[in-house]
Amino acid sequence: MSPSVLEPQSVPTLVNVGLKAVGRNDAPVERDARGLSKPLLELMPTLGTDAFTFSPIRESTVSRAMTRRYFADLDAHAETDIVIVGAGSCGLSAAYVLSTLRPDLRITIVEAGVAPGGGAWLGGQLFSAMVMRKPADVFLDEVGVPYEDEGDYVVVKHAALFTSTVLSKVLQRPNVKLFNATTVEDLITRKHHAESSSSSDDGEAEDEAKVRIAGVVTNWTLVSMHHDDQSCMDPNTINAPVIISTTGHDGPFGAFSVKRLVSMKQMERLNGMRGLDMQSAEDAIVNNTREIVPGLIVGGMELSEIDGANRMGPTFGAMALSGVKAAHEAIRVFDLRKAQNDKC
């Protein structure tokens, strides 16, 4: 097995997200020789008989159980530490690393689709297998996804195995909340002031026109899709000192943040994703994952629209490791951005 990508020097205190801790039964489950638990085996013969019935419930109980928790999450994450825009392979990988290394941080994932995972449920041309070039196998080892080792690359038997594994691990973290079927409609901005009149501690030049990203503007995806035929559907907001945008290459919701930077005059133009070149594309995406403007880190294929990088097609190693790099960058700049964000 390859060494872990995660080497935390200390384990910070777990963040309190506003709800009571999730109850878990960590006691070992008794199983028979066939592998099923004793309670399930005892239940099976009753299914379809008069002896089987669910516990009683009233419809309003279900409504309140969902509503209470969702609005508690909205309240808890209105002010968060890190927002990840887009829950594809890059965004989920970033969420995994962040929530592991910094359990003290509140991490909010905003995904436009009902189903998280982006394009990582299948390989190329709707085929099942997922190919990752080494050293991305290190991340597969980290999350426990099995694969076939083919020398310079590895093959996961079904892309959904990777996505569902990372997704399940991320969603179990108490400091992570996923808001799916929710889109980011805009970015919250503040005028960016460098630390001195010439440059800041991290080398940022003073520029009166420069902005710092201080959160995201959200709405239900279905509402966002109908702004042209309905009126007065104002959004909601989430404040955060660091945003990681991993919305993919240009498309209906793709490359959203970087396109918005152009319209806000923070970038002159996008260079546009180039044609497919697996050899150069993956290195470029991982190595150039970075903070584009203060408070906004861009990773994955969204980055290709800024840099004019090649697309890599159906090989996914760069998506996973770009997420790892994005998490590393977020941790690196977090204290500075939080200090700036707390001033306003």
Swiss-Prot record:
GO MF, any single term: cysteine-dependent adenosine diphosphate thiazole synthase activity
A single GO cellular-component term on record: nucleus
EC nos: 2.4.2.60
Keyword tags: Cytoplasm, Iron, Metal-binding, NAD, Nucleus, Thiamine biosynthesis, Transferase
Example of a GO biological process term: thiazole biosynthetic process
Signal peptide stretch: none
Cofactor list: Fe cation
Record text on subunit structure and interactions: Homooctamer. Interacts with cyp-41.
Family: Belongs to the THI4 family.
Record-given protein name: Thiamine thiazole synthase
Organism listed in the record: Neurospora crassa (strain ATCC 24698 / 74-OR23-1A / CBS 708.71 / DSM 1257 / FGSC 987)
Source taxonomy: Eukaryota, Fungi, Dikarya, Ascomycota, Pezizomycotina
